[in-house]
């Protein structure tokens, strides 16, 4: 499951390693959360060139499956948020939702934000930007 930053690198072509790694994965094995999709839409709407960014995103989205957030994943979200809050290590609300989604489905989260996501027990991470 790609995080927003990795999707952004791929759609903009700003990181060759991300592009290389994506080319090695079967099309049916690349996912984003609907939460990431919402963040992508926000980025497009906030962009000085929204038409260009929408076109780039749509091209990439043709090869990626967008996964709806399952009702059952709210339990993982509650566990993640309460644990991080108890430890005084909260991360962004959308990041906690994305983490809960990936962890619930047993998917590896591909992100360049290892520092924050590594605070979440049981979440498998990879960084394709390095």
Question: What positions do the PLM features span?
Answer:
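Generic structural signal for small/hydrophobic residues in well-ordered secondary structure
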Residues: 3-4, 18, 40, 77, ...
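Short catalytic/metal-binding and nucleic-acid-binding patches
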Residues: 32, 36, 43-48, 67, ...
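Active-site neighborhoods of divalent-metal-dependent phosphate/nucleic-acid chemistry enzymes
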Residues: 65-110
């Amino acid at each position: 499951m790609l995080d927003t930053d990795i999707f952004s690198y791929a759609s903009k072509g700003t990181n060759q390693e991300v592009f290389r790694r994506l080319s090695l994965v079967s099309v049916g094995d690349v996912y984003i959360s609907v939460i990431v999709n919402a963040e992508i839409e926000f980025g497009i709407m906030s962009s000085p060139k929204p038409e260009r960014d929408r076109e780039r995103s749509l091209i990439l989205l043709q090869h990626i499956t967008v996964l709806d957030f399952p009702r059952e994943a709210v339990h993982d979200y509650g566990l993640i948020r309460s644990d991080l809050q108890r430890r005084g290590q909260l991360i962004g609300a959308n990041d906690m939702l994305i983490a809960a989604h990936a962890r619930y489905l047993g998917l590896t989260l591909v992100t360049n934000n290892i520092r924050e996501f590594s605070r979440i027990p049981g979440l498998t991470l990879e960084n394709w930007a390095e």
